[in-house]
Design a protein with these regions (language model features):
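Short, internal active-site loops enriched in acidic
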Residues: 407-411, 442-447
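Domain-level signal for soluble alpha/beta catalytic cores
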Residues: 2-4, 10-16, 22, 38, ...
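Conserved, mostly hydrophobic/aromatic
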Residues: 47, 76, 404, 440-443
């Protein structure tokens, strides 16, 4: 909701219940006390006391940061207006000096390397796709979480990556299917090449003495890099699947001589499954409409289901009712004959809202709607205790961390505020320092200009930085509104400053030591029907 003040005198809030110094929506209150705290070593009185302390300490700071934004923007607007009638326009150097004078450009920081530890491998060292999904929708939340593994054949057959007319409904298009298989085998030749020949000519895959053997033209051929074979299922002489690995990502070859595809394949290969959505942001912000207590309760309830491993949903597909829950882990046998498992689920981050929004699901001691980001912080972190304390079998983090993405922060002071908030929450929940990791979204102009200082402010807990065209462009337009006309959207995409923004994000991230410890993300793709364009666009990112 907006930042308007609300009071307990308003009849809308007449049924709110008193907790510590707060007035709380009965729906949210019941959810917290009977569902969130049900199996945690935290009683309701302690939770609400912690919540009240957070608001007392951080609400004034939150308001002060927003006032700083307003004052800086007013100064920038006036500076641009002052240039209109000047014969000699200000130089770039003069504009930079002005921005430093008002504190918009922060003081430089010395070179440093982030010290984040206990980040899961999915964050620290596995490169791959990251999904963003509205956590308010249980079906979408589950689909994204379960997208850790996906069929390459399906992805190619059902999208325009393959340069053929999209398959018609009502049956299998064998011509398109053949092109999918050709494309996929070429991918295998690139990712896991053979010492001789091609995967396209393979007629069998078996394991002998812990080594993968591929039959090509009646000869037994090995992988050029034998270490890329990491596991299998079934029998060694007739495996159900072969597990390969390239660039930290797994590739699973599935075999079924009776399958629709496998029966016509020389090697009996039915599908190729790729490790796909390595991480997923369960979103409480941009992709959801959560404006009141009812909405927020649903958002938090679904997050609770994910952290407890219990989230399920049902939906109708044709004439059948389909039930969906979280995928189990995937079991394999190593080349040496040892059993091991891989997560069947995407590693989850949760995006809280930024510093601007307030929400009247809880009213403070003055009857005002509270900063929603503070509420998101304490509630999502408390819920994450179920995973961090290993209270479920379908775990998220294996390192005892939780991951909060914080959007729309303006500069290092706002990042410092977030880190201080997280530190306080960690103390309240008896968590080790820096257990709550932070994703910094580089989507505001003041953050881009001060990215190194922003990362420095969170150097002990930062686990990603990323870019985003729409929000970053929007803030550029808003900030420079009085500077004159700006390019149309399509032309902005090719503007020098956008390219510089993307490149700078990567360079600064690497200079600050994010490689091997944190993610550097490259914006969101919101056009699922344009997969070919996505592949081409992402290939061009720095």
């Amino acid at each position: 909701m907006s930042a308007n003040t609300t009071t307990t005198d308003n009849p809308i809030y007449s049924d709110y219940v008193s907790r510590n110094s707060l007035s709380v929506s009965p729906q949210l209150c019941e959810f917290i006390e009977t569902e969130v705290l049900a199996d945690l070593p935290i009683d309701a009185d302690t939770f609400w006391q912690n919540f009240s302390e957070l608001l007392n300490e951080f609400s004034p700071r939150n308001k002060a940061l927003l006032l700083t934004r307003e004052n800086m923007q007013a100064a920038i607007d006036q500076w641009h207006l002052n240039q209109i009638d000047k014969k000699d326009k200000a130089t770039d150097a003069e504009q930079i000096a002005f921005l430093r004078e008002i504190g918009y450009i922060a003081a430089d920081v010395e070179d440093f390397t982030i010290t984040t530890d206990n980040a899961d491998d999915a964050i620290a060292c596995i490169p791959g796709p990251q999904l963003v999904v509205p956590v308010k929708n249980a079906r979408y939340a589950l689909n994204a979480t379960n997208a850790r593994w996906g069929s390459l054949y399906d992805a190619l057959y059902g999208t325009n990556v393959i340069e053929l007319p999209v398959a018609k409904k009502g049956g299998y298009d064998s011509f398109r299917g053949a092109e999918v298989i050709r494309f996929a085998r070429h991918f295998l030749d690139q990712a896991t090449p053979l010492t001789n020949g091609s995967h396209a000519d393979a007629s069998g895959y078996t394991i002998h003495n812990g080594q993968l053997s591929i039959t090509v033209n009646s000869e037994n051929i090995a992988l050029k890099n034998a270490e890329k074979f990491v596991g299998y299922t079934g029998n060694a002489d007739a495996p159900k699947s072969i597990l390969l690995k390239n660039n930290h990502l797994h590739i699973e070859l599935l075999f079924d001589n009776t399958g629709v595809i496998g029966k016509d394949d020389a090697a009996g290969m039915q599908d190729i499954v790729l490790e796909s959505a390595i991480t997923t942001i369960q979103d409480c912000e941009d992709s959801v409409a959560a404006v009141d207590a009812e909405d927020k309760t649903l958002v938090y309830r679904n997050w609770l289901g994910l952290m407890r491993g219990t989230l399920t949903t049902e939906f109708k597909k044709g004439n059948a009712i389909v039930a969906r829950g979280l995928n189990e882990d995937r079991e394999y046998t190593s080349p040496k004959g040892n059993d091991f498992s891989l997560s069947g689920r995407s590693l989850l981050l949760v995006r809280n809202v930024g510093h601007l929004m307030t929400n009247d699901a809880v009213l403070d001691a003055n009857g005002e709607a509270i900063p929603e980001g503070i509420m998101d912080g304490i509630v999502t972190a408390t819920i994450a205790l179920y995973d961090m304390q290993k209270r479920n079998s379908l775990h998220n983090s294996t390192t005892g961390s939780m991951y909060i993405v914080k959007p729309k922060m303006h500069g290092p002071e706002e990042v410092t505020f977030t880190c201080d908030l997280f530190s306080k929450i960690e103390q309240q929940l008896a968590l080790p320092a820096n257990s709550i990791k932070l994703g910094i979204m580089d989507e505001e102009r003041r953050t881009s200009l001060n990215l190194k200082a922003c990362i420095h402010a969170a150097k002990d807990r930062v686990i990603f930085i990323n870019t985003g065209f729409l929000d970053r462009t929007g803030d550029e337009i808003h900030t420079a509104m009085e500077a004159g006309p700006i390019l149309p959207k399509e032309l902005i995409k090719d503007a020098d400053w956008i390219s510089a923004y993307e490149a700078s994000n990567v360079v600064i991230g690497l200079q600050c030591g994010l490689s091997g410890k944190a993610q550097i993300g490259k914006g969101m793709w919101a056009m699922p029907d344009e997969m070919k364009a996505m592949v081409e666009t992402k290939d061009g990112h720095p």
